[in-house]
């Protein structure tokens, strides 16, 4: 008897384009959310445009409150929850980069209230996914949460954000290329459930960014448009899968281990991008697509070597050989790879 079922949670509205920040209140009204909005932001976006966001909520008849978070931590999540309760917030709006969006997402999930994602940078696919990422000590935790009810991504704001944040978002998407290969491998060898739809969507998204990498240039709003659409597609793939598998494989394990070994040295997206060069080589060997991955990263000014990440070769090899210990997720790293194999892969691909 067939008993399989699934529950896919997706954003109800995705608004992307020039000046769409001014349509945030309109998007919220279409969701019929009740109560007071709590805008969760960090110091930089607060200086940039939070007044603009607050004023349109006021014009629409809302009484918004604002919470500014200084760091990403579980304590920050708890403080936002306390603020939301004190301000009797009906829904939360994450406004800024990955930090306020992840914190607002997790706080809204804990309070079982609505969450709206309003990114001002395209640094990773957390702007639309059902995962929150929070560091604790030398470990970064990925926590399940409901995805946003709406995503409002103003390409004008995003195009004016620091270029390295955009290149990190691009690299995060390009790394989906090897994440899907790891997922397929785990399906074949460990009988891990695999979604053809989610896998194909994630793979297509990575391919689209690789194919268009030459068009992604600093200061071009069209580049922000391409990257945001890719980040949305990646987040949707994870929601369909009910897992981060479509966008997180061995390259993410290596990145998480780098967070432990060399904390706050490089951006997450840049780390997974460099790691994906190595993991593609491990998957496919000398004749594989690692050069294509590397060249796509280079064309958008993203790092392609450990040195460009600011990480010495010894630490990168240590992260690669111990990354399998991070979590119980089968990848091309298996139960760990030998030091000599890691050095050979990193040296052949030019990562070292």
Curated annotation (Swiss-Prot):
<dbReference type="GO" id="GO:0106357">
    <property type="term" value="F:glycerol-1-phosphate dehydrogenase (NAD+) activity"/>
</dbReference>
<dbReference type="GO" id="GO:0006650">
    <property type="term" value="P:glycerophospholipid metabolic process"/>
</dbReference>
<feature type="binding site">
    <location>
        <begin position="98"/>
        <end position="102"/>
    </location>
    <ligand>
        <name>NAD(+)</name>
    </ligand>
</feature>
<keyword id="KW-0520">NAD</keyword>
<keyword id="KW-0443">Lipid metabolism</keyword>
<feature type="binding site">
    <location>
        <position position="129"/>
    </location>
    <ligand>
        <name>NAD(+)</name>
    </ligand>
</feature>
<dbReference type="InterPro" id="IPR032837">
    <property type="entry name" value="G1PDH"/>
</dbReference>
<keyword id="KW-0594">Phospholipid biosynthesis</keyword>
<protein>
    <recommendedName>
        <fullName>Glycerol-1-phosphate dehydrogenase [NAD(P)+]</fullName>
        <ecNumber>1.1.1.261</ecNumber>
    </recommendedName>
</protein>
<feature type="binding site">
    <location>
        <position position="172"/>
    </location>
    <ligand>
        <name>Zn(2+)</name>
    </ligand>
</feature>
<keyword id="KW-0963">Cytoplasm</keyword>
<comment type="similarity">
    <text>Belongs to the glycerol-1-phosphate dehydrogenase family.</text>
</comment>
<keyword id="KW-0444">Lipid biosynthesis</keyword>
<dbReference type="GO" id="GO:0005737">
    <property type="term" value="C:cytoplasm"/>
</dbReference>
<comment type="pathway">
    <text>Membrane lipid metabolism; glycerophospholipid metabolism.</text>
</comment>
<dbReference type="GO" id="GO:0008654">
    <property type="term" value="P:phospholipid biosynthetic process"/>
</dbReference>
<feature type="binding site">
    <location>
        <position position="256"/>
    </location>
    <ligand>
        <name>substrate</name>
    </ligand>
</feature>
<dbReference type="GO" id="GO:0046872">
    <property type="term" value="F:metal ion binding"/>
</dbReference>
<feature type="binding site">
    <location>
        <position position="268"/>
    </location>
    <ligand>
        <name>Zn(2+)</name>
    </ligand>
</feature>
<keyword id="KW-0479">Metal-binding</keyword>
<dbReference type="GO" id="GO:0106358">
    <property type="term" value="F:glycerol-1-phosphate dehydrogenase (NADP+) activity"/>
</dbReference>
<dbReference type="InterPro" id="IPR016205">
    <property type="entry name" value="Glycerol_DH"/>
</dbReference>
<comment type="function">
    <text>Catalyzes the NAD(P)H-dependent reduction of dihydroxyacetonephosphate (DHAP or glycerone phosphate) to glycerol 1-phosphate (G1P). The G1P thus generated is used as the glycerophosphate backbone of phospholipids in the cellular membranes of Archaea.</text>
</comment>
<feature type="binding site">
    <location>
        <begin position="120"/>
        <end position="123"/>
    </location>
    <ligand>
        <name>NAD(+)</name>
    </ligand>
</feature>
<keyword id="KW-1208">Phospholipid metabolism</keyword>
<keyword id="KW-0560">Oxidoreductase</keyword>
<feature type="binding site">
    <location>
        <position position="172"/>
    </location>
    <ligand>
        <name>substrate</name>
    </ligand>
</feature>
<dbReference type="Pfam" id="PF13685">
    <property type="entry name" value="Fe-ADH_2"/>
</dbReference>
<feature type="binding site">
    <location>
        <position position="125"/>
    </location>
    <ligand>
        <name>substrate</name>
    </ligand>
</feature>
<keyword id="KW-0521">NADP</keyword>
<feature type="binding site">
    <location>
        <position position="252"/>
    </location>
    <ligand>
        <name>Zn(2+)</name>
    </ligand>
</feature>
<keyword id="KW-0862">Zinc</keyword>
<dbReference type="InterPro" id="IPR023002">
    <property type="entry name" value="G1P_dehydrogenase_arc"/>
</dbReference>
């Amino acid at each position: 008897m067939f008993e399989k079922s699934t529950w896919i949670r997706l954003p109800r509205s995705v608004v992307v384009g020039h000046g769409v920040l001014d349509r945030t209140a309109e998007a919220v009204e279409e969701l019929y959310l009740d109560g007071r909005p709590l805008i969760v932001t960090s110091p930089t976006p607060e200086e940039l445009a939070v007044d603009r966001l607050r004023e349109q909520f006021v014009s629409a008849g809302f009484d918004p409150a604002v919470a500014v978070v200084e760091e990403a931590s579980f304590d920050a999540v708890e403080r936002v929850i306390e603020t939301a309760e004190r301000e009797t917030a009906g829904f939360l709006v994450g406004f800024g980069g990955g930090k306020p969006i992840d914190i607002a997402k997790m706080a809204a999930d804990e309070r079982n209230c609505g969450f709206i994602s309003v990114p001002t940078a395209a640094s990773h696919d957390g702007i639309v996914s059902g995962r929150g990422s929070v560091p604790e000590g030398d470990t970064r935790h990925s926590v399940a949460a409901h995805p946003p009810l709406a995503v409002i991504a103003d390409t004008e704001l995003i195009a004016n954000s620091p270029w390295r944040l955009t290149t990190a978002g691009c690299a995060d998407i390009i790394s989906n290329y090897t994440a899907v290969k790891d997922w397929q491998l785990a399906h074949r060898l460990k009988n891990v459930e695999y979604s053809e739809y989610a896998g194909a969507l994630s793979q297509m998204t990575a391919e689209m960014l690789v194919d268009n990498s030459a068009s992604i240039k600093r200061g071009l709003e069209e580049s922000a448009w391409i990257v945001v659409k890719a980040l949305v597609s990646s987040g949707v793939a994870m929601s369909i899968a009910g897992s981060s598998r479509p966008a997180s494989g061995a390259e993410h394990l290596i990145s998480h281990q780098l967070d432990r070994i060399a904390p706050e040295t490089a951006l997450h997206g840049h780390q997974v991008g460099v790691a994906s060069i190595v993991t593609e080589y491990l998957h496919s060997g000398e004749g594989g697509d690692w050069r294509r991955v590397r060249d796509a990263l280079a064309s958008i000014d993203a790092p392609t070597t450990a040195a460009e990440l600011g990480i010495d070769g010894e630490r990168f090899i240590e992260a690669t050989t111990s990354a399998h210990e991070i979590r119980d997720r089968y990848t091309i790293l298996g139960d760990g790879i030998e030091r000599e194999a890691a050095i050979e892969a990193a040296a052949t691909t030019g990562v070292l």
